[in-house]
Amino acid sequence: MNEFVIKDGGARTEFASGMVRDTAEGKIDWELVFNGPMLERWAIHLTKGNAKYPDPEPGKANWQRASGIEELVRFRKAACRHFAQAMRGDTDEDHFAAVFFNLNGMAYVDGLLHRDTAPQVKKLH
């Protein structure tokens, strides 16, 4: 724990209070994902999916077992189907959230299949 170094971008911003911080230049603005309804709708979709397909082990969702082309194709087909249903105006389920879910699944499997070229995403926990 004591071995880490606080990263330094070099540029500083001084606030009216006198507090000084690195600038936010070039950093991801994670607050932006909270704008609009989709983050909550996706979380609701994931919660309902987790009730239907429980975690096979603590901290690992059922969909995270996906690891190959077959699963990637299933995610892709489902994303296309839910997109068409959303565009058609179907309201039998949250098709917009289902598109998010399936695109995320595709990206997850694609990352596993192309680890050397895929952007690396770290777990938050």
Where do the language-model regions lie?
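Intrinsically disordered, low-complexity regulatory regions
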Residues: M1-H125
